[in-house]
Amino acid sequence: MLLAVTLVACGESRAANEGNGRIADVSVTPGSDHARAVPRDSSVLSLARAAGGVDGRHYTVSAQATSGFIVGKIGGGEPRDTSIAPTHDLSACRPFTQSLVPSRDGGVGNSVVWLVGVATGPRDDAPRRVRVMLDGCRLEPRVQRVAAGGTVMITSRDAMMTRLQFLEVGGASASRGTASRGTASRGTVLLNDAGQVVPTSDAAKVAGLVQIRDDLHPWIRAYLVVTPHPFVAVTAADGEFRFDTVPPGSYTLVIWHERFGTRQQRVRVDAHVETRVDMRY
């Protein structure tokens, strides 16, 4: 794992910063605190406890007198297209190719990025209502954010029986792909015809990473990133992300991808300073 972290002062000249005893540009060399691979389950579960309080579930919206910025890029891995050849319900399910690792300019798309340990800050800008579309025997979008307490609208264009399970990633049920007693299921949605629209709020009731998968068609999958605070992002193909108005302090930055697993890195945010974080799978 390679890491480059650069701190750049925002809105002030180098001379002014040096005059105030501050350093405008700081290069941090990877050392004992560099980005590292971590057990998939423990790191993914940190999204559910990424806010403040003893249990990590309490986030307070408040104006910040001072704040900093985090700008980063996720790279590495290999761009991959997966060819799907359905074996049944062929009237709706035709062979298709799906890009699980969209990539442009060396970036890794569909990576989820979040900060752990943020107790207060601006209001979460994640949408409170999102749509997941079943069309051509696949779910779109593959990965998307939704605010905790939001609603997920499941829409079908396929005339076939589908049983969608909502499973917390990191739990035993998600690793097996089935819901069983005592595992972390967030509900089931049944579809049987084109044109159906089924809302569910259970899937987004609390923060966490949720996998959607079909019991009857195992290649049908998608992910919901239920956000605990505003500092959660899903990267586009260029792998870039940005967090504005971050309260000054030290945090753990975690990245996850369904193919590459998880990495995490300690980052420090200072007032009026842009922290640059480049991480590679």
Give the positions of each predicted feature.
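Bacterial N-terminal signal peptides
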Residues: 1-8
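Extracytoplasmic copper-binding redox domains, predominantly the cupredoxin/blue-copper superfamily
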Residues: 10-281
